[in-house]
Design a protein with these regions (language model features):
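N-terminal capping/lid subdomain adjacent to the active-site entrance of alpha/beta enzymes
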Residues: 1-154, 161-168, 172-175
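Conserved functional loop/turn residues at catalytic and ligand-binding sites
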Residues: 178
Length: 184
């Protein structure tokens, strides 16, 4: 399980989209967003609602008017990009004229015991770690993670789990531990 303030994820069901044209296949996927009540099932209903348009060869621009922003549109948009790249024999970055470059990946530590959170943080090899917190053992959890990863840039995300008073209490303590940002 992966826990944040007020919610625990026990599975991630995914909508997979496959589009085919001229023996080329474009693929896209999305998990949806729980706080918008998106699920694989609801995204599938949305995707199927424009099946006719997809079969007639809808493009990315038209897609923006056919579906609202969300997981279904994202999965189809990714499949359209992938298909266009394969049909043209170019990469996405060549199609967009954006040079590829290295990016910093952020791994997230979900809410768990001090020991598990520290062990998960220690196992990450990324320079930035996002730590999910609720309103319990906040300082202790961050101290354990900082001890496990003294080299990491740490960002805290409490998902609206703190009051303003809690923020005022923890902010100076977290600053002393080198926390880069608190996301509320």
């Amino acid at each position: 399980p992966f826990s944040i303030t007020g919610y625990t994820f026990t599975e991630a069901r995914v909508l997979y989209v496959t589009l085919t044209e001229n023996n080329c296949t474009g693929q896209g996927e999305a998990t949806g967003v729980y706080y918008l009540d998106e699920s694989a099932d609801s995204m599938l209903v949305q995707a199927n609602s424009i099946k006719k348009e997809l079969e007639q060869g809808v493009d990315r621009e038209a897609l923006q008017t056919l579906l609202p922003a969300g997981g279904a549109r994202n999965a189809i948009d990714c499949a359209l990009w992938d298909l266009e790249a394969k049909l043209s024999g170019q990469s996405i970055w060549e199609l967009t004229d954006i040079e590829p470059h290295d990016i910093t990946t952020v791994n997230t530590v979900g809410i768990d015991t001090l020991e598990k959170m520290a062990a998960i943080a220690a196992a990450f090899d990324t320079p930035v770690i996002k730590v999910k917190l609720d309103n319990r053992l906040c300082l202790e959890r961050i101290q354990a993670i900082r001890a496990a990863r003294p080299d990491a840039e740490i960002v805290v995300d409490v998902n609206q789990g703190w009051t303003f008073e809690q923020l005022k209490t923890f902010a100076p303590q977290f600053k002393a531990l080198g926390i880069a940002m608190i996301e509320q």
